[in-house]
Structures are given as structure tokens and as C-alpha cells.
Regions:
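N-terminal accessory beta-strand-rich subdomains and adjacent acidic, glycine-rich linkers
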Residues: 1-185
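Short glycine/threonine-rich loop-to-helix capping motif typified by GTGT followed
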Residues: 359-368, 399-400
């Protein structure tokens, strides 16, 4: 049984077939393998909601995966009694004060009870080794929110299209339902999407973030580079993270800790034998930035004309209006300078969801994000893009590498005060789980970036076993293998672990066992059989 619920500004209906009301026509086509819904209106029509529900027989031991909204959103297999927590455990005044509902989907998706879970763009039901994949082929017209209700035995599709105005044709849903083994269903899904396999090599590298965080300087970068001197094998990339700029948004104004500028830093990295990489958040502007002070008209604004906050990082930040010609001209100047003048060849582009914090009258949230990703690809030219903090589907086939989990933390579970917050909060355990459960994206959509591993003893709260578990998982499933350690300071024992980790890759994995309470990974290191076990509760 299938039910379509369609609501516009002046019409609503529930039906299970195609139909027409005045100037609005809808065409619903269903089969066992594909479901599509297309609208046509002769006059401008405002959509309020489009929901399509059909039956699915969940079984007691099924494992369910629903892709989270963006890079950082926790995305793991759950049992049929699983639940996703929203911000309902956090006082509203705290949510509003720190803009905690901006990182994920809390402002535009309702969360359900136990056994009611949702995701974006695609998801699957795994029954032992047999997969049933539900995948949207029509994401640019609006994000498809996919819901599993295991108590009701239903699958629901919802279009993120509230307030969208259209005239003419509008494809709401185009869903494929694929059955088979893991590789079978995902190979076919990405073939249908028209996304060519990602052939980029696995990158090894160093990033400055998880040691000094924003407190980097020319001196600290030089010291980190010196740490690699004399290494048997240099990493591919040395990436300078946040902390060099005056403020987020002021990309061409360096702070006092970088008096010689970023071209000088890139030259030093090249001279050391590595590819220069740099961090940018191109669609974000910090409240205290020169950009916000001098160009308030560049900011995204809500229906009340107020700047749209994107979160509480730094001094708080706003999203930029990517359709403003002056914003686009500024971003072109930034990318031309960073790539062509300074010489950075890998761009870590972060907080990208800031572009689509609010939809436009004539563009859904997804359309805005797709436009934003095309803009970045054009601006970057032949520089490598490592996407981060981005809704995933718009980045498929656009970025070369992409973060597929939240930030790791110096302890295992993340800070206790942050755990009840949104699903994007930093946590080593959560990002490790995302690395495993989003493994199907690696080599298909891009090469996966699982975030860094750390083996060091100083400035560290994880046990040695936890550190080595993270490093092994990153190597087994990642297309990026970065650290923030001073590798030159490793003793012989840590150097041996580092060299052993570098030899691991996906071909070493022999089996993955996932239950509602734990994840077990079986793999080989040469002739040695090994396994890793991680709690998923």
C-alpha cells in the first residue's frame, strides 16, 4: 500500500495514484525497483509538504543505516529498536544562545521515537549479508528525507521543500530500490547517479589542528616541518589548519603570528618535499571579522532580515549569500590568491553547510548546496578539494576527498557536557563508527577522510589501545591518513606502530560484524589475524 500526501499553499490531498487539481498535475509511477513523483503546474505554486509512505516488512534482527545530514552527523547501523536523539534534552535558551540547531537538521526535520529513524538521500536495511538499498536520484530538486518506522513497518519519503515556489515541471522523488550484496547495491546506485568512481590515491599527511588548534604560528609550522626532516618516508601533504587568518572570512588578512604571509609557508612546505595544504571555510564569516563589519550585505538573512547564524564556533559566525555577485567575486579573489599566488594544492574547505542554512523562494536547501559545490569546484581549478561539514549528496563526484565523520577528540567519547547536544559534536568513538559505516562512499563518491589519528602520549587523554584502534580503523577504511603528531618525536616503538599502520588498507579487512551493541572488524596484517571491537551504544 502506498500513500501520497501532497500539500500546497491552496490545495491538499491524500491519494495513491496520479491526478490533477486545477493547474497542478502529479504523476506517480511505482514498481518494485523504482518510485517516482513528478509535478507540473501552469502557474507559480508554493509547496508546503510532499510525503510518500509505503509498507516494508522489517524483521527483528535487521540492521538499519540512514545517512546523516552532513559530514559530521553520526551515521551508523542501528537495530530495529534504535533511536536518534535530537536537541530535545537541551534547554531551548541554551540552543538559541549557542545556535546549536544550525549544525544539523534539527530546524527542519522532526525526530521520532524508538524504532523511528531518518536520514538523507539514501539508506539501507541489512539482513545478514543481504542489502536493500533505498537511494534517491533526485536530490538537487530538494533533499529527500528517508524514514524507517519499524513499529509501523513503513518507509516514508519526505521532500525538504517547505515554501518552495515552482512553475512548470518539478521532480519530487526518483527513488531506486536495490537488492544484493554491499558492493553490488552501491556500485549500481552510483552508476545510476552518474558519479564516476573516485580514482584519487590515498593521501598521507600532517595537519596542524589537533595539537595547537588555532594557536599556530610561523614558528610552530617551521618546527613541525623540521620534525619530518630525516624521515624515511615523507607524508604527501602538510596542511595548515585554522589559526593563520585574522578571523574566519578574512582569508587574505593574516594575523600577527604569520608576518611573512602564507606564500612563504607554502614555499617552506614544498622545499621540505610535501604538498602544501590549507584550511578555509569559504561560506562562513565570523561575527568579529572585518568582512562582517564592512560587508553586512554579504550575509545570509532570514525572513526578518536578520543575519543567519551558522553555529557558535569562534565568536559565532554567519553564512554567506552565495548568489550575491560581490560574494562570488570575493571568493574568486580568495581562491585565485590561495591557489595561484600562494601555491596551495590541497584545499580543506570546511563548514560548507553554511551556504544552505536557509532555502530561497525559488531554490530548495539542496539546490543552494549543489550550486555552492559547483562554485567551489570551478574556483579551485585543478587544486584538490577536501570537503568537510558538507551535506553529502551535493558533494558526490565534486570533491576529491571528503570528511565522513565528526571531529575526533583527545578523549574517546568527547567532552561529557557536549554528548547530549546535536549529532555533529566531536567524538573519537563517533567518527570511528562513521568511518566504518560510511565505507561504501570511499572510491565511489570520493576518497573518504576519517579525520586524524594520534599516537603521541603528550596532550592526550586516550589509552594506548584506543589510539591504536583509531589509527588502524582510519588506515583500513580511509582514503586519507593524516596525523597531527610530531612524527619526528616518535620513539622506536611508536615509529614501528606508525609504519605498521601505513601498510593497512581495505584489502586487509576480512569481515565486519555489526550488531546493535557492538562492531567487530576482522583483518589481516600479513599472516597475522587481528580484530578490533568497538561498543556502539
Amino acid at each position: 500500500m502506498m500513500t501520497l500526501s501532497l500539500k500546497t499553499a491552496d490545495f491538499s490531498c491524500k491519494t495513491n495514484e496520479s491526478g490533477q487539481s486545477g493547474d497542478l498535475r502529479w504523476e506517480l509511477v511505482t514498481s518494485e525497483e523504482r518510485i517516482s513523483l513528478r509535478l507540473h503546474s501552469e502557474k507559480e505554486t508554493e509547496l508546503r509538504s510532499v510525503v510518500l509512505k509505503f509498507n516494508f516488512p522489517f524483521e527483528r534482527h535487521d540492521m538499519l543505516y540512514l545517512n546523516g545530514y552532513q559530514s559530521w552527523t553520526d551515521s551508523r547501523e542501528r537495530g530495529v529498536k534504535g533511536r536518534m536523539h535530537s536537541l530535545d534534552r537541551v534547554p531551548k535558551r541554551i540552543v538559541e544562545k549557542f545556535s546549536l540547531d544550525r549544525y544539523g537538521d534539527n530546524r527542519f526535520v522532526l525526530y521520532g521515537r524508538k524504532g523511528q529513524m531518518h536520514g538523507f538521500s539514501y539508506g539501507y536495511v541489512r539482513r545478514s549479508e543481504a542489502y536493500t538499498l533505498f537511494g534517491s536520484l533526485a536530490e538537487e530538486s530538494g533533499f529527500t528525507v528517508l524514514r524507517f518506522d519499524t513499529g509501523e513497518n513503513t518507509v516514508t519519503l519526505e521532500k525538504d521543500c517547505m515554501g518552495h515556489h515552482f512553475t512548470g515541471d518539478y521532480t519530487v522523488f526518483d527513488l531506486v530500490i536495490l537488492h544484493g550484496a554491499e558492493d553490488e547495491v552501491f556500485d549500481e546506485y552510483f552508476r545510476l547517479l552518474g558519479v564516476a568512481p573516485a580514482k584519487g590515491k590515498r593521501l598521507t599527511g600532517y595537519t596542524s589542528w589537533y595539537n595547537l588548534y588555532e594557536n599556530i604560528s610561523e614558528e610552530s609550522i617551521a618546527a613541525d616541518l623540521k620534525g619530518f626532516a630525516g624521515s624515511k618516508t615523507l607524508p604527501d601533504v602538510f596542511q595548515i589548519d585554522d589559526g593563520y587568518e585574522n578571523a574566519v572570512g578574512d582569508w587574505l588578512v593574516m594575523n600577527e603570528r604569520f608576518p611573512h604571509g602564507m606564500k612563504d609557508a607554502a614555499d617552506q612546505i614544498r622545499e621540505a618535499g610535501m604538498m602544501p595544504g590549507i584550511w578555509l571555510a569559504p561560506f562562513a564569516a565570523e561575527k568579529k571579522s572585518i568582512l562582517v563589519k564592512e560587508h553586512p550585505d554579504w550575509l545570509l538573512r532570514n525572513e526578518n532580515g536578520e543575519p543567519q547564524p551558522g553555529g557558535c564556533n569562534w565568536s559565532g559566525f554567519y553564512g554567506l549569500d552565495i548568489y550575491n555577485p560581490e560574494v562570488r567575486a570575493y571568493l574568486k579573489e580568495v581562491f585565485d590568491t590561495v591557489v595561484r599566488d600562494w601555491g596551495y594544492k590541497l584545499l580543506k574547505l570546511d563548514f560548507l553547510y553554511a551556504a544552505c542554512l536557509i532555502p530561497r523562494r525559488d531554490k530548495t536547501r539542496a539546490e543552494v548546496m549543489y550550486d555552492g559545490m559547483r562554485l567551489l569546484r570551478e574556483l579551485a581549478g585543478d587544486a584538490l578539494i577536501l570537503g568537510c561539514g558538507v551535506p553529502l549528496a551535493p558533494a558526490f563526484g565534486v570533491v576529491d576527498y571528503c570528511r565522513i565523520g565528526c571531529d575526533m577528540t583527545l578523549n574517546w567519547l568527547g567532552d561529557a557536557y557536549m554528548r547530549p547536544l546535536h549529532r555533529e559534536v566531536p567524538s573519537t568513538r563517533n567518527t570511528l563508527l562513521n568511518t566504518v559505516y560510511r565505507r561504501h562512499l570511499d572510491g565511489r563518491a570520493w576518497r573518504n577522510d576519517p579525520d586524524v589519528f594520534l599516537l603521541r602520549d603528550d596532550n592526550m587523554k586516550m589509552s594506548e589501545k584506543q589510539r591504536e584502534t583509531l589509527a588502524a580503523v582510519d588506515a583500513l577504511f580511509g582514503g586519507v591518513l593524516f596525523t597531527s603528531d610530531n612524527v619526528g618525536a616518535y620513539d622506536a616503538e611508536k615509529r614501528a606502530v606508525y609504519e605498521r599502520i601505513e601498510k593497512l588498507d581495505r584489502s586487509c579487512v576480512t569481515k565486519i560484524k555489526s550488531t546493535p551493541s557492538k562492531l567487530t572488524i576482522f583483518y589481516r596484517e600479513g599472516r597475522k589475524k587481528s580484530k578490533l571491537t568497538v561498543s556502539t551504544r
